Amino acid sequence: MKLDKLFEKFLSLFKKETSELEDSDSTILRRSRSDRKKLAQVGPIRKFWRRYHLTKIILILGLSAGLLVGIYLFAVAKSTNVNDLQNALKTRTLIFDREEKEAGALSGQKGTYVELTDISKNLQNAVIATEDRSFYKNDGINYGRFFLAIVTAGRSGGGSTITQQLAKNAYLSQDQTVERKAKEFFLALELSKKYSKEQILTMYLNNAYFGNGVWGVEDASKKYFGVSASEVSLDQAATLAGMLKGPELYNPLNSVEDSTNRRDTVLQNMVAAGYIDKNQETEAAEVDMTSQLHDKYEGKISDYRYPSYFDAVVNEAVSKYNLTEEEIVNNGYRIYTELDQNYQANMQIVYENTSLFPRAEDGTFAQSGSVALEPKTGGVRGVVGQVADNDKTGFRNFNYATQSKRSPGSTIKPLVVYTPAVEAGWALNKQLDNHTMQYDSYKVDNYAGIKTSREVPMYQSLAESLNLPAVATVNDLGVDKAFEAGEKFGLNMEKVDRVLGVALGSGVETNPLQMAQAYAAFANEGLMPEAHFISRIENASGQVIASHKNSQKRVIDKSVADKMTSMMLGTFTNGTGISSSPADYVMAGKTGTTEAVFNPEYTSDQWVIGYTPDVVISHWLGFPTTDENHYLAGSTSNGAAHVFRNIANTILPYTPGSTFTVENAYKQNGIAPANTKRQVQTNDNSQTDDNLSDIRGRAQSLVDEASRAISDAKIKEKAQTIWDSIVNLFR
């Protein structure tokens, strides 16, 4: 029955009842005196009921409500894209890198997809005889059983045809509710209009769950009997068909007795449906279940090679494009991203070296997050969101690079202190106060061990991360200027107290991704792009359903960006970033630390943010919760610097190698760089040419392994397609 005809019936019935009500109104006016006398003798409740025609009114209201619900469910069915279902079930969601090369896949609830010709006729018949005996005759709905389920408020089982079950498995939850049953009804009608019975049966058998994490008849046949779906015997087919009612309850690995009893019931159904005779039933029922069990299922091949990046892709698809996790994983999408596999692989290999990360006395590793972002487009080229021990476990782990809320420490100074100063016309060598000051109740000093002096030039104040000049600058320019700048650079300043401490990051919460986006403005001539992972998403039919539109926001003038870069070049040559400086590459940027509340000699957060015209690398290090047992010793140069330098040294060779057009502020003022390649290497034994070569080699192996696995899978898929075509020629 077509949906349009259903609504025609609703409307005709509605019109009929309305017409009858109008007729009854005219009739009562013509009643005789005796009729009215009889009416007067009726009880007051019945009299009231009859006088105002409440039966008719309730009936019309009920029909109206039913009509509205029907319209809503009709709209739900029409808005659901059933055209893509077959393609979505056949294919996995694939993730592509920025060069549109396949980088991995999301498996979801998918098994090995096979065509109906590769599924045993015994298995097809067993399923139809048990789940939907009128399958080839009905239009997707068993109306009697469906309305029984509706009357019992969804509590009555067995009301679903194979088509309805396919609709439920593909689009709906497993809840036994009237709403779900009604949606299932309309979706089943839509599926019946779009697909043939053979296509529906094929999709159902490939999308059904068979327990033990196994989906689809092909993988289920291998899991329980060690054969392909085309090779299952009659008794094996009956066992698999019986599992559909309760995959865990009738699972032969969980209970041979329950599974055997259920198998025998299916065999009886097949006799009743005329698919087999009594002798075949008896013979199949005598087969010992345990003798048939043989597991040859190899499990799913994991293509989740870049966990932190793929997690971030899924999170962005959910939060930005309003897709559900289930849709993303199971609908066979093609997700094109900004991923650079060379960046990502090298970053992951660096994080696997746990000796680079501090460890608490109880053995807990400090956590960390790093982002590599292209400053012109905002495309994230690589991200690692957890230390390697945790990064490979599970799906959608917490990502410290994109989801954490940490104090930025001194990395906020270029944003809220020195950018407003440069915009106000301050010269880079302007002398700033560098002596201990008391501002009402707020007293500030430089970080432990850093000397104070009467004055210091602004470029030195930034490079050496001096607190006193930074706070003095905000005091001179006004706290409001600092807040305006922070908001302009994309920081959330709404709940931050308007105090001078904002110059040091007080009250501000951020993460490496957000800071990378902010610093991109310095690398991109004052234009800040929108950080993003996804460039576009296509559905299983190749239609673009979501896409990123590159946008840049002018946050500062190019001249201001150039002057800021000139000062931040000094961070890595003469300032706090010397130990973070990569070999053979020039970077600008800033370091940052946050003092531990219980001891100012320890730190809660350590940051290094560095950039070239081609890439921004933002790195954070710290324990999830800082306390007397979990803290970082020393400053950034003792912790985060080692990880940052390894990342920079391994991914910078893959960048175009663009150079800055501005001169280091130290050099402008006649001061030679303090860092040398020799000094950098002697600060950390892990940073050797052999070590870098090993990291790059292992990273290349990871990329090559991904490429080979994808290539092998495509060859296997293509070979299967060719073979199926050859077989079909002789059918």
UniProtKB/Swiss-Prot annotation:
Entry GO MF terms: acyltransferase activity; penicillin binding; peptidoglycan glycosyltransferase activity; serine-type D-Ala-D-Ala carboxypeptidase activity
Location of this chain's protein in the cell: Cell membrane; Secreted, Cell wall
Outcome after substituting E131Q: Loss of transglycosylase activity with dansylated lipid II as substrate
Region feature (Transglycosylase): 78-300
Chain positions covered by the region annotation Transpeptidase: 301-731
Region Disordered, residue ranges: 674-694
Biotechnology: Transglycosylase/glycosyltransferase (GT) domain of this protein may be an alternative target for the development of new inhibitors of S.pneumoniae as the beta-lactam antibiotics targeted against the transpeptidase domain of this protein have increasing resistance.
Residue intervals annotated with topology Extracellular: 78-731
Principal localisation: membrane
Region (Hydrophobic): 78-156
Keywords in alphabetical order: Acyltransferase, Antibiotic resistance, Carboxypeptidase, Cell membrane, Cell shape, Cell wall, Cell wall biogenesis/degradation, Glycosyltransferase, Hydrolase, Membrane, Multifunctional enzyme, Peptidoglycan synthesis, Protease, Secreted, Signal-anchor, Transferase, Transmembrane, Transmembrane helix
Active site: residue positions: E131, S410
InterPro entries: Beta-lactam/transpept-like, Cell_Wall_Biosynth_Protein, Glyco_trans_51, Glycosyltr_51/Transpeptidase, Lysozyme-like_dom_sf, PBP_transglycosylase, PCN-bd_Tpept
Domain notes: Has a penicillin-insensitive transglycosylase/glycosyltransferase (GT) N-terminal domain (formation of linear glycan strands) and a penicillin-sensitive transpeptidase C-terminal domain (cross-linking of the peptide subunits). Transmembrane signal-anchor is required for the synthesis of longer, 20-30 disaccharide units containing, glycan chains.
Functional note: Cell wall formation. Synthesis of cross-linked peptidoglycan (PG) from the lipid intermediates. Binds dansylated lipid II and catalyzes the polymerization of glycan chains. Hydrolyzes S2d (N-benzoyl-D-alanylmercaptoacetic acid) molecule, a synthetic thiolester analog of cell wall stem peptide. Active against bocillin, a fluorescent penicillin. No transpeptidase activity with non-fluorescent lysine-containing lipid II as substrate.
The protein's assembly and partners: Homodimer. May also form higher order oligomers. Self-association may depend on its transmembrane and/or cytoplasmic regions. Interacts with MacP; interaction is required for the function of this protein. Interacts with MreC in the elongasome.
PANTHER family to which the protein is assigned, alphabetical: BINDING PROTEIN TRANSPEPTIDASE, PUTATIVE-RELATED, PENICILLIN-BINDING PROTEIN 2A
Protein name: Penicillin-binding protein 2a
Classification of source organism: Bacteria, Bacillati, Bacillota, Bacilli, Lactobacillales
Gene name in the database record: pbp2a
